[in-house]
Curated annotation (Swiss-Prot):
Classification lineage: Bacteria, Bacillati, Bacillota, Clostridia, Eubacteriales
GO biological processes: D-amino acid catabolic process
GO molecular function: D-tyrosyl-tRNA(Tyr) deacylase activity; Gly-tRNA(Ala) deacylase activity; Ser(Gly)-tRNA(Ala) hydrolase activity; tRNA binding
Reactions this protein catalyses: glycyl-tRNA(Ala) + H2O = tRNA(Ala) + glycine + H(+); a D-aminoacyl-tRNA + H2O = a tRNA + a D-alpha-amino acid + H(+)
Chain's gene name: dtd
One Pfam match: Tyr_Deacylase
Motif Gly-cisPro motif, important for rejection of L-amino acids, residue numbers: 137-138
Matching InterPro entries: Daa-tRNA_deacyls_DTD, DTD-like_sf
Source species: Clostridium novyi (strain NT)
Protein name: D-aminoacyl-tRNA deacylase
Localisation: Cytoplasm
Length: 149
């Protein structure tokens, strides 16, 4: 399971011109799910996301987590995180998990995040979405449950 975590001042997602999720201070998390992912990968990713210490403390150090600052989450599914661009110019997505299996793990991730974060907003799984992000920092991190990077 992979995620791009972006610290944001605000972020929103729209489908067909209608805003379906928006947050203020927190993280926008783009989530990709692979064919090899299980509930253990979901647990790993959730633990990392909610506990990442990338918000400033009173001394200006990146020392506070999303939970510490009562931050918000906007979670967006993005199978293209498993795009393999090493060969040719057209990405291959054969490592991405598709359909209902991917949707279930995505929803499990959302549910687990909701257990610890007060405001969790989401995109629409499988939809064509317009995501607006106002990066803060910018602070952008890549997380892989298989620790490939």
């Amino acid at each position: 399971m992979r995620a791009i975590v972006q610290r944001v001042k605000e972020s929103s997602v729209s489908v067909d011109g209608k805003t379906i999720g928006e947050i203020k201070k927190g993280f926008t998390v783009l989530v990709g799910i692979s064919k090899d992912d299980t509930i253990e990968d979901v647990k790993y990713l959730k633990k990392k996301v909610v506990n990442l210490r990338v918000f400033e403390d009173e001394n200006g150090k990146l020392n506070k987590s999303l939970k510490d600052v009562d931050g918000e989450l906007l979670i967006i599914s993005q199978f293209t995180l498993y795009g393999d661009c090493r060969k040719g110019n057209r990405p291959s997505f054969i490592e991405a998990l598709g359909g209902e299996d991917a949707k279930k793990l995505y929803l499990d991730f959302i549910d687990m995040c909701k257990e610890e974060i007060n405001n969790v907003q989401t995109g629409e799984f499988g939809a064509d979405m317009l995501v607006s992000i106002k990066n803060d920092g910018p602070v952008t991190l890549m997380i892989d449950s298989k620790k490939e990077f």
